[in-house]
Amino acid sequence: MNQGTPHIVLAGGGTAGHVNPLLAVAGAIRDIEPTAQVTVIGTAVGLEKDLVPEAGYELDTIEKVPFPRRPNLYMLRFPAKWKRETAKVRSILETRHADVVAGFGGYASAPVYATAHKMGIPIAIHEQNARAGMANKLGARWADFIGTVYEGTGLKPRAGADVERVGLPLRPAIASLTKRIGDDRAAVRRESAAQLGVDPNRPLVLVTGGSLGAQSLNRAIASSAADLLAHAQIIHLTGRGKISEVRELVTASAGADVLTGIGPESAGQGDYHTAEYLERIDLAFACADLVICRAGAGSVSELAALGLPAIYVPLPIGNGEQRFNAEPVVNAGGGLLVADKDLTPQWVHEHVPDLLADHERLAEFGRKAWEYGIRNAAEIMARHVLQLAEPSK
């Protein structure tokens, strides 16, 4: 350690799924050890480009070095590019006097892992997905500590490495909400409902397919508006460019009078609240009795940490990665899993109203989700990173 002050380099980025956990751990490190010097290695094109400086951390950038997946011209160029970027990483780690490197996956992580290993710098890894990505699979060969959100990620740690399910380091707004609802969920619900323009005394279903929306989810739910509104009010976040179709389907099902927006001015105007996107998703989480959503790793972990029952509809692409994200909490009793192809208006009609009417079953889903969820992942991960920075390590 550098004269009693730990110098910690965090690596990762590209998507919010990599950047948000990184920043959560960075904040926890500073909370535990205010003297710690924390910097980040990322790319100049990922979300970290803006989010890291905005959070108050210095960002050192390298170019993306994705591993070749098939024989092509890039495969021929890869060795030279890898050598150039790892040399740049070595310079950064030397300049930053790094005591430990902690990686969160993404393009920037792989060259950092390889370089830190050659320099003898301890390595910690956080893997957020049920099936690990290529960068973290590489880093696991050399890591001293691996923190995961799921069991069975496919990572193969070296002999002697510590591996622990630590959970997902939560975004500040979500971490704050977990503490507040633990103290007084009803009060938090009332305050949040006032800001959204919804009734805190009526059940609420939150529907979201992410920032881009989910067409199949949008159509199945909006077409079932009349069935659902008999049991609950709805907040439907449609995704960009998809709100018109959703409103048309709702109108066809339940009439135009049920439609309204989101915000205090919408109170009492209708029970089907629509918007393309909601910046303060924590407000909707605070009011929700049931969430119908995709099964991204971040979404699943946040809903479990909040103890929210959910119907997960995995994105039907790749090797079914999203299904693997949702299966553990569903198997623990924290919700339902339905394939995208099966989510039809008929499925909604046959399953969701009965679930909303069964308050005991819904409450049990919530209890099981809460028991499965982990709310202090950022602190756990931060303590492991700081431990690796100690001279004895």
Swiss-Prot record:
UniProt EC number: 2.4.1.227
Membrane topology recorded in Swiss-Prot or TrEMBL: Peripheral membrane protein
Enzymatic reactions: di-trans,octa-cis-undecaprenyl diphospho-N-acetyl-alpha-D-muramoyl-L-alanyl-D-glutamyl-meso-2,6-diaminopimeloyl-D-alanyl-D-alanine + UDP-N-acetyl-alpha-D-glucosamine = di-trans,octa-cis-undecaprenyl diphospho-[N-acetyl-alpha-D-glucosaminyl-(1->4)]-N-acetyl-alpha-D-muramoyl-L-alanyl-D-glutamyl-meso-2,6-diaminopimeloyl-D-alanyl-D-alanine + UDP + H(+)
UniProt-annotated location(s): Cell membrane
Classification via CDD domains: GT28_MurG
Enzyme class, first EC level, given as a word: transferase
SUPFAM superfamilies: UDP-Glycosyltransferase/glycogen phosphorylase
A GO term from the CC aspect: plasma membrane
Annotated family: Belongs to the glycosyltransferase 28 family. MurG subfamily.
Protein task: Cell wall formation. Catalyzes the transfer of a GlcNAc subunit on undecaprenyl-pyrophosphoryl-MurNAc-pentapeptide (lipid intermediate I) to form undecaprenyl-pyrophosphoryl-MurNAc-(pentapeptide)GlcNAc (lipid intermediate II).
UniProt name for this protein: UDP-N-acetylglucosamine--N-acetylmuramyl-(pentapeptide) pyrophosphoryl-undecaprenol N-acetylglucosamine transferase
Species this protein is from: Bifidobacterium longum (strain NCC 2705)
